[in-house]
């Protein structure tokens, strides 16, 4: 697993209080991990802080799974 994936997973575990085994790349923040809309906003803010990036609202709305977050962050940090 990449460094980005590990960091994203750690943030999700800390913010949502879920078991590490539940945080897979295909896991949906809302459907699988029990996040609500406020949780997803807080996750986006945590990703922005951790990776030093800005995630515009239109992009944040499309980050629905752990993999979506990893892919977006990898794209932003590679640029």
From Swiss-Prot:
InterPro entries: ACP, ACP-like_sf, PKS_PP-bd, PP-bd_ACP, Ppantetheine_attach_site. The modification O-(pantetheine 4'-phosphoryl)serine is found at residue 37. PROSITE patterns: CARRIER, PHOSPHOPANTETHEINE. The keyword Lipid metabolism applies. It is found in: Cytoplasm. SUPFAM superfamilies: ACP-like. GO terms for biological process: lipid A biosynthetic process. 4'-phosphopantetheine is transferred from CoA to a specific serine of apo-ACP by AcpS. This modification is essential for activity because fatty acids are bound in thioester linkage to the sulfhydryl of the prosthetic group. GO terms for molecular function: acyl binding; acyl carrier activity; phosphopantetheine binding. Its main location: cytoplasm. Disulfide bonds: none annotated. Residues 2-77 form the Carrier domain. One of its GO terms (cellular component) is membrane. It comes from the Bacteria. Keywords: Cytoplasm, Fatty acid biosynthesis, Fatty acid metabolism, Lipid biosynthesis, Lipid metabolism, Phosphopantetheine, Phosphoprotein. Pathway: Lipid metabolism; fatty acid biosynthesis. PANTHER family: ACYL CARRIER PROTEIN, CARRIER DOMAIN-CONTAINING PROTEIN. HAMAP family: Acyl_carrier (MF_01217). Belongs to the acyl carrier protein (ACP) family. Carrier of the growing fatty acid chain in fatty acid biosynthesis. This is Acyl carrier protein.
